[in-house]
Amino acid sequence: MGHHSCCNKQKVKRGLWSPEEDEKLINYINSYGHGCWSSVPKHAGTYTHIHGFCLQRCGKSCRLRWINYLRPDLKRGSFSPQEAALIIELHSILGNRWAQIAKHLPGRTDNEVKNFWNSSIKKKLMSHHHHGHHHHHLSSMASLLTNLPYHNGFNPTTVDDESSRFMSNIITNTNPNFITPSHLSLPSPHVMTPLMFPTSREGDFKFLTTNNPNQSHHHDNNHYNNLDILSPTPTINNHHQPSLSSCPHDNNLQWPALPDFPASTISGFQETLQDYDDANKLNVFVTPFNDNAKKLLCGEVLEGKVLSSSSPISQDHGLFLPTTYNFQMTSTSDHQHHHRVDSYINHMIIPSSSSSSPISCGQYVIT
C-alpha cells in the first residue's frame, strides 16, 4: 500500500497519536475547519500561542484521526440490534462498501462498521447458516404447508395412498400380469354379460349361467350367484392374478398371456377331445396327464359352445365327464356395483390346450 506524497517528506511522525497531537488537531479544526486535509498539518503545526508546535503528521493521518476518533458527533459504544439489522441489509445490497454503509449510520465510521461486521456479524451468520438456519427454514416451510388449506380435495395425509394408487394404475395399464389381488373387483351380477367374458373365435370356452336358485355351494367364505363353472379348478398364487376391475364391452377384446403353471397343478383338469370311431364322432374327456386315456389330436371345435355331456360316449376309453357346481353369490356390501372376488377369480380360470386356439397350450384364460 503506497503512502501519500506528504508522508514521504522528512519529519513525518507515524504510529500512535499522542494526547497533545489530538488536542492540536481538535483546536485547529474547531477554529478553522478542516478544509483541505493536506494543508491541515502545516497550519495546525505553525508555532503560535494557540496551536504550539506544528504537527508532524500527514494530511491523510489527520483526516482518519479526526473522522474515526476525534469528531464530536462520533457515536461510541456497542452497536444496537437495529444498527446490526441495517448493516446486514445494506451489506446484502452494497457488499463491502463500508463508507457507503456508514453514511446510513449516523455517528458510525466505515472502519468501525467493517470491524463490527468481521468480528461479530459475519461469524454469527456463518454459525447460524450451518447449524440453525436450515432447520429453521424447514420448520417455517413445514408450518406454512401445514396451515395451507386443502384445495381440490388434497390432503397431505393421503399423499402416500394416492401415490400408491397412481403407481398401481401405472403397473395395471402397463402389464396386466402384475396386478395384485387388491385391485380385483367385478360389477354386480345383474350387470355381468357374456361380453365381459369373451370366448375365442374357435369357441374354446363359454360362460354358462343357470336359473336354478335352489342350488348353492359354499367355498372360501364366498357366495356366488347363479354361476356354473367347470370343475375341478386349481388354487393358484394370488400374487399374479389378472384384474377384471374394468372390462369394456368389446367383442375384439384380447386377453393377455398369463404365466405357465407346473403340470402337477393342472393334472386334475379335464379336456374335451374329439375322436372318430368309423363314422361316429365321439366326445372324449381326458386329462392332459392321464396315461391310461387315449391321447388324440384336437379336431373341430364348435364355435361358441361347450361340448355337452349328452353326446354318445364310448365306454372303452375309460372316460369321465366334467362336473359343474352352482354357487350362490350374495352381496354383503353396500356397494352393489363392485365386489371383492379374489377367490372367485381362482374358480374362473381353466386351461386350454386346443391347437386351434390363439392361446397356446399350457396357458390359462379367464372365461
Swiss-Prot record:
GO terms for molecular function: DNA binding; DNA-binding transcription factor activity. The keyword Transcription regulation applies. GO terms for biological process: plant-type secondary cell wall biogenesis. The keyword DNA-binding applies. Disruption phenotype: Male sterility due to a defect in anther dehiscence. Fertile pollen. SUPFAM superfamilies: Homeodomain-like. Residues 37-70, 98-121 bind DNA. Residues 9-70, 71-125 form the HTH myb-type domain. GO terms for cellular component: nucleus. InterPro entries: Homeodomain-like_sf, Myb_dom, Plant_SW-associated_TFs, SANT/Myb. Keywords: DNA-binding, Nucleus, Repeat, Transcription, Transcription regulation. It is found in: Nucleus. Induction: Down-regulated by auxin. It holds the Pfam family Myb_DNA-binding. Highly expressed in flowers. Probable transcription factor that regulates lignified secondary cell wall thickening of the anther endocethium, which is necessary for anther dehiscence. May play a role in specifying early endothecial cell development by regulating a number of genes linked to secondary thickening such as NST1 and NST2. Acts upstream of the lignin biosynthesis pathway. This is Transcription factor MYB26. It comes from Arabidopsis thaliana. The gene is MYB26.
